[in-house]
Regions:
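Bacterial carbohydrate/catabolite-sensing allosteric modules
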Residues: 1-61, 71-182
Length: 182
């Protein structure tokens, strides 16, 4: 039986769907044995604790979030590692990712079909899926000759509420607004 160590939170819909998909794949192609470390485990024991746990359990693969590349998991464990990182794509490991630029282009096309000429984007700075959605959206808006407006921040919602409110009021109307997150 293949042992898969999961470093996945289950608080978001994406994560829950990912977990369901892994279980379904295991049923069709397994059997796989999953073990999900609680999200607090990394905070309590750090990367070395996760590495130690994976070695002791004799994991055959790791799937999940790994926020920094200070430990080379493949070198230390000699097993496949697939990551779903929030801020950036890993250059060391395989990545679970989406066609974020394509999502941005599709959003712009959706609004263009509804005859919008002003296109606004609200995003989070420094997060791969937000950055790439903006890029795709902006590229498509530029291609179709629309006007593009963007607001991006890495601050918490309560810190930027007034800035966002002012930005929204100043946008030319009518405007198509694409937000980075569902």
């Amino acid at each position: 039986m293949i042992k898969i160590l999961l470093l996945i939170d289950y608080s978001s819909e994406f994560d829950r769907k990912l977990l369901r998909g892994l279980v379904q794949y295991s049923k069709e192609n397994g059997p796989w044995l999953f073990y999900r470390l609680p999200s607090y485990y990394s905070a309590m024991y750090g990367e070395q604790g996760i590495l130690k746990w994976a070695k002791e359990w004799k994991a055959d693969a790791i799937i999940g979030q790994w926020h920094n590349d200070t430990i080379d998991l493949q070198k230390e464990l000699n097993i496949p590692v697939v990551l779903q990182n929030y801020h950036h794509r890993s250059v060391t490991y395989s990545n679970l990712t989406g066609d974020y630029k394509g999502t941005g282009r599709m959003a712009a096309q959706f609004f263009a079909k509804r005859m919008f000429r002003n296109f606004a984007y609200f995003g989070i700075k420094g997060v791969v899926w937000s950055d790439e959605r903006r890029q795709g959206y902006h590229q498509e808006v530029k291609r179709i000759g629309g006007d593009f407006f963007s607001f991006e921040s890495d601050k918490q919602e309560d810190e930027i509420r007034m800035e966002v409110s002012q930005w929204l009021q100043e946008l030319p109307k009518p405007v198509a607004l694409f937000c980075c997150d569902d």
